[in-house]
Amino acid sequence: MSRFLSNSDISRLNAAKLGQSVTLGMDSFDCLCRAKEMFGKTGGAFDISIGALYDCWLHEDRTLRQPSPTEIQHAHALTGLNHLELDEDGFCAEVLTEGLQFDLGGIGKGYAAEKVAEILREWSLGQALVLAGASSVLSVSVPEGMSGWPMKLRNPENPNEVLGRFELKEGAVSGSGRQKGQHIIDPRSVDVGPVKGRLAAWSVAPDAIAADASS
């Protein structure tokens, strides 16, 4: 599901022409459906069709560039999941605006964590904690005798400093931050570029996909 692999479903969708129907694997299609659901729930704040804005605002090493107003307007015209149509009967996707660039980075780890949890439940290993990298955690279930999995939220500028502690009983927690570059962009307005004010944000949600997309 990576846009950096030339033969992936997402890369094929990114290369699709206007009106072309692209048949996807079940996981890719399901992930796109959940992404579109979160797009609606967040009022467009979470948007996987943000690739054009990434290319507009960021160099390849994720350092900030200064695009012209024309570049910004063009990138915004190529952003928005309202430009993507999904066919649940045929597991197909069609882009309604040519040039859209999709990136599942904001939801992919959460989706993978949910798939791992499904397998663990099938194997009757429900008392487990799924770690998806350093930023997403999913509690499948808490072992008997525990009130919850101990969680720590650390200062992104000083990992030795613990900002908060809590116990995760059910659901997931996910975090996003700027320590690896200014890659967090609000796609809803042409007047807002990469986030500069806050260093990090965390989200707790009933499932890992919602937590990942909301953070």
Where are the language model's segments positioned?
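Mature catalytic core of soluble alpha/beta enzymes
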Residues: 1-215
